[in-house]
Amino acid sequence: MVQLAVAQNRIAEIRENLLGNHPDKILVVSHRADWRNAPENSLQGIQNCIDMGVDMVEIDLKRTKDGHLVVMHDKTINRTMNGKGLVEDYTLAELKAMRLKNGVACKTRHQIPTLEEVMLLCKGKIMVNIDKGYDYFQEAYAVLEKTGTVDQCVIKAGLPYEQVKAENGAVLDKVIFMPIVQLHKEGAEAIIDSYQTHMKPAAYELVFDNDNPEVLNLIKKVRDTGSNLFINSLWPELCGGHDDDRAVELHQPEESWGWIINQGAKLIQTDRPALLLEYLRKKK
């Protein structure tokens, strides 16, 4: 009972920081789990994130031949499993008979997880960010309901509000939905205005390949709406050059993570979760 209460408090704390206005608290989002130390999108990688104190883990979804949602980034299993072909051409049992590969392409003991397995592992411990998974919105929501984890999952899409609402109806209002906006592309401001008019999202994922004045003005516009900012530090083209490797390899964390925080970001998605957590703890 005590352990359950602690877990519930952990999710409540993360949700409060995600949904509220607490600029002093930065949430760390780990991209494809802890892929440097475990197979990407694996249960072990997710457990590593839980153990190190990550706030949210990012995953991707595909559907098997027999209709199960599994956690996989690519359309094929060629890169990440000891097999070849499209995920959709295999049954879940066939995929489970194979093994995931690690970052240097060696077969491990780990199996591809289902969304249900991931949500049960994460329940009460860590938030989940479904990135490549909008195509399965309704099916994913059914899994969240079944596992009792609707309150700890974020679903995202880079689509206009009108399309997302038309395709999902009332379900859209039952989840934490985060629009993805590419600030360096035409129409970005119109997408922001559309969402602000209709739903005022808890946060926007902002993508930008430069940090010119036009992009910075749009970042400020989103910040001024009261919605939180989710910014990727994964590689330069996602954050105007203020990426993880700039922090780690060039030893310029203030020009990377510090710059992102100074733009008002509440959530930082990283491929260096342990180092970002260390950086944030030192800043307290």
Model-derived features: where do they sit?
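Phosphate-group recognition and catalysis centered on beta-loop-alpha active-site segments
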Residues: 2-284
